[in-house]
Structures are given as structure tokens and as C-alpha cells.
Amino acid sequence: MDIRFSPHNSHLEDPTSFHFLDPHLRQLSRLPLVYRSELLGQLPRLIPGIYTISGGRQVGKTTLLKQWMAQLIKENIEPARIAYLTGELIDDHHSLVRLITDVLNDMPDSDLKFLILDEVTYIKDWDKGVKYLADAGLLENVVFILTGSDLVIIKDARMRFPGRRGQSDRVDFFLYPLNFFECVKLKSLFTFFAMSKFMLNFLNHFLCIQIYNCFIIILIYDNIIFVHFSTTIL
């Protein structure tokens, strides 16, 4: 693998120390509260295809992917079948095709491969590169995950390789910032078992108002202001 990507692929050298060597997981371990997204249980493991994860900048997409890599290793996926690349270091689709071809050739031939291309929209004409790789049959046995913050570009590019996404029922994912309910759960101020029936009913009522009534909700909790606006059912 290109040495530029080594800091994000320390699992190839020492999978048992991935949590300590990876920059994102190391930073995550220092935080007092760590959120585990439900997407970790929804991302593909068995079906090859081209998948996307969209979301705003700094919402945690890269950290989510590193958690997913660690989870794959924990589930006894061979580390050599997992690779992470970032589009910030790839100039154009020509470089992308060469790099991914080399990475896939270095992986074991048998079994499913897991390839992550983070911040794909940094790469000029990235969709041309992905289309070529798919048409050349190089992605037939690959769970290929692309991420990006520019939803318009990603949505437009998805249309350029229809029929090449794979057989999974779901191929597109979106990572949202934590909402108020998730923040409260993360704070561990209550559990569903310990909460009184009154509080549970109140919480359900609050969520219904938040979802169905299309207005701004402002809550002040623990000196933090939470603002939420919704015009559609989430």
C-alpha cells in the first residue's frame, strides 16, 4: 500500500493495537462520552457492492468508518482484506484507478474484500474512476464504501453508474448529527427501565411534536442549547 495511507491502515501491521495506533480511534478513546451509531450494525458485511455514506462535515463519518473497521477485525475478518483510502490524497480518476487496482491486488484473492474511500468528492472526476473499476469487474467481490459531504455531487454521480451498485436492498446511508434524544441517552441520565411512565409518555409526546409539526424546537439542557428544525418526517 502507498505509504501515504499507512497512518490510517495500522491494522495491517498490528490489528491487535488498531484502537491505539489509529489517529481517529485514539482520539475517540480520550473522550468522556462515546456514541455508537446504529449505522455500525447496518453497514454491509456479506454483499459486495458500491455503497455511499453521506453527511455534513465534521459529523463523524471518518470515525464511524474506523469503528466499523475495528468491528470487522473483531468479527474475525482478515485484516489484509480491509483497506482505507482518503480522497484528500488522490488527484484524479486516473490516480484513483491505479491506486485501487494496486490495493485490491495486494489483498487475498479469495473471500470478500472491504475497501473504504473517504472524502471521495476531493477527487476530480471520481465517478469516472468508480465506473471504470465496476465495468472492469474489479469490484465484483468488494464491499466498496464511498463517503462525501457534498450531497448534490454524490446524488448526481450515483446516477452515472446505475446497475453497478450490487444486490443489497440498501446501498445509501446518511449520518446525522446527534439529536436531543440521543444526547440525553449518551449522558446516561435515564434508561427506559428506570424512567417513570409519566416521563416515558412525555418523551414520546415530545418526539411526535418534533417530527410532525415542522417548527423550530429549542431546548436548553446542561448549559447546551439544542435547536432542531424539521419540515419532513425523519
Per-segment meaning from a language model:
Residues M1-P44:
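N-terminal pre-Walker A segment at the start of P-loop NTPase domains
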Residues D2, I154-L234:
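Interdomain motor-coupling "hinge/lid" segment immediately C-terminal to the ATP-binding subdomain
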Residues I53:
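Hydrophobic anchor at the beta1->P-loop junction of P-loop NTPases
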Residues K61:
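Conserved lysine of the Walker
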Residues L64:
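Hydrophobic positions on the alpha1 helix immediately C-terminal to the Walker A/P-loop
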Residues R81-S110:
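Short glycine-rich substrate-engagement loop in P-loop NTPases that contacts/grips substrate
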Residues P108-V130:
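Conserved P-loop NTPase "ATPase switch" module shared by AAA+ and STAND
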Residues A136-F161:
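Sensor-1/coupling segment of RecA-like P-loop NTPase cores
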